């Protein structure tokens, strides 16, 4: 048996999570979005500038099928493809539209049969990176670097009824907006500052890869040019 603790920060207590309550346009579609990092859960609880709660659960992963996008066998492009599949992007050019279709067609992963997804969390600041990559203004190296800023950007999402049945509520504790809303804003601001720096630096990356290069060269996940940048 492998039991881990999952935390869900929100504005109310959730003793029994419901698979039917959620947003189908979240990062990985409908599901229960959690973190294993207490500070992250506290920030989520107060992200609307209200007091909130961190709900704590024991989660038994025994017998569950887990897709771990961070285990080294997948790349940031797999994450991008799933994001493009579920989230609503601003596609204001033909390149962006073609990039969406190509990445979904060649890099997406069928979530059917999976109970849990572990991957990056595309909050507003991270989502800005993703949109810029699809629009061909941010290179792959900068996108990959941005998503490795720290574990606070990682999440565990329960996406099947079988997975929900493995969640066991422990307790919930209150979180003050006066403490954690400023922290939420500060982290977002730092991520945006890093984004601007990466955009500026990307102009000098002569050997980098932009999404248009991936389209023109029809690059796959195991292309040595992509591997060189992602694992340098």
Segments (PLM) and residue ranges:
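Conserved NAD+-utilizing ADP-ribose enzyme module
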Residues: 2, 48-52, 61-232
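Extracellular structured ligand-interaction cores
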Residues: 4, 31, 54
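Extended catalytic/binding region for NAD+/ADP-ribose chemistry, centered on the ART fold
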Residues: 23-48
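Short, charged/polar surface micro-motifs in flexible loops or helix N-caps
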Residues: 13, 38-40, 62-65
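Extended interaction regions within the primary functional domain
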Residues: 12, 20-22, 57, 67-71
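ADP-ribose/NAD+-binding catalytic cleft of ART/PARP-like enzymes
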Residues: 1-27, 231-232
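Short His-Asn-centered micro-motif
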Residues: 8-10, 34-36, 57
